[in-house]
Design a protein with these regions (language model features):
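Amide-forming acyltransferase catalytic core, primarily the GNAT-like/NAT-type
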Residues: 1-49, 184-189
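Conserved donor-binding loop and adjoining core beta-sheet/short helix segment
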Residues: 27-102, 211-240
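Acyltransferase donor/substrate-recognition loop-hinge adjacent to the catalytic core
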Residues: 111-184
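Aromatic (often tryptophan-rich) hydrophobic motifs at membrane interfaces
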Residues: 206-281
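A mid-sequence, solvent-exposed acidic-amphipathic segment
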Residues: 166-231
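Conserved active-site alpha-helix within GNAT-family acetyltransferase domains
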Residues: 103-117, 269-281
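A residue-level signal for conserved active-site and pocket-lining positions in enzyme catalytic cores
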Residues: 15, 151, 278
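Short catalytic-loop micro-motif centered on adjacent basic/acidic residues
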Residues: 95-96, 160-162, 262-265
Length: 281
């Protein structure tokens, strides 16, 4: 069996070496996501024979990432066979997730008609043109511009944007604690945010917040694992302050995403309100 070890901060360089070679437009290949969510998903990794193997699950149900090598070298079929053997040794089926089209074709070529493929709609990433989110030009985004213009008019001189620093990190986390208290389904995200904030410099994470009359009304965290894409890991705002979500989205993108082509706002997890919001862009 493969000798999997729990993911820790010390695995950052190893994960980056394998997973940042190519943008697969799936946030689960982001080293930041792998590390900050490791505790929630019980993520483990193993490097063997030039491949990095990653598995997540509680021991009863485990999900494997496709084995990745440096420069697509090595025996991919043999690497997948190791996953199959590992799963079968535990009496499980081998379930491989986060396949892009290239990896799906590679897997099917190596194992014709052996795997059944299903779309994971709730886990699909929302990828946007970066300049579109920065400028909000066009008819589709007219409503977003209106929300921002109303916010700027209503709160002129009363709001300010701050980058995440050691000086405001506790305020940032306190806001998210208060926000998450209203919805238990975001407790796991709170744990991930705690890891991200405690190690934001080491992990290369950028953050931003908006204050209104000195009080935080919106926060966000993101990172850039690939040359052409920025990933937004966390975004929260006050529902009772119209325009706050649109403001934090645009303000952060303006300051951090000018030099990338895409912005990945991750998945909606099947949450109706989140899906509606992300589709609206």
């Amino acid at each position: 069996m493969l000798d999997f070890k729990p993911v820790t901060l010390e695995h950052k360089d190893l994960i980056e070496k394998y997973y940042t070679q190519k943008n697969r437009f799936i946030c689960d290949y982001s080293p930041v996501d792998i590390i900050i969510w490791a505790h929630n998903y019980r993520t483990k990794i193993c490097e063997e024979d030039g491949f990095l193997f990653t598995v997540a699950g509680d021991g009863n149900i485990e999900y494997f990432m496709p084995p990745i090598s440096i420069g697509d070298k090595g025996d991919f079929k043999g690497a997948v066979e190791k996953l199959i053997a590992h799963a079968e040794a535990k009496g499980d089926k081998c379930v491989i997730i986060n396949l892009d089209e290239e990896l799906r074709e590679k897997l099917e070529t190596a194992f014709p008609n052996r795997f059944k493929y299903d779309e994971m709609r709730d886990n699909g990433d929302y990828i946007y043109d970066a300049q579109s989110l920065i400028t909000l030009k066009g008819k589709k985004l007219h409503g977003k511009r209106n929300h921002i213009n109303k916010f700027l008019k209503e709160y002129d001189g009363r709001w300010e944007y701050e980058e995440l620093t050691e000086n405001n990190i506790h305020d940032f986390f306190d806001y998210q604690i208060g926000w998450s208290e209203n919805d238990n389904q975001f407790f796991g995200e709170l744990c991930a945010s705690s890891t991200a904030l405690r190690n934001f410099k080491y992990l290369g994470i950028k953050g931003g917040l908006i204050r209104l009359d000195g009080k935080i009304i919106a926060i966000t965290l993101g990172s850039q694992p690939f040359d052409d894409m920025y990933i937004i890991h966390i975004e929260k705002a006050d529902y009772d302050v119209p325009g706050s979500y649109q403001m934090i989205n645009q303000q952060f993108a303006m300051r951090n995403c000018q030099n990338v082509k895409y912005i990945d706002r991750e998945e909606d997890l099947g949450i109706e309100g989140l899906r509606k919001s992300k589709l609206s862009y």
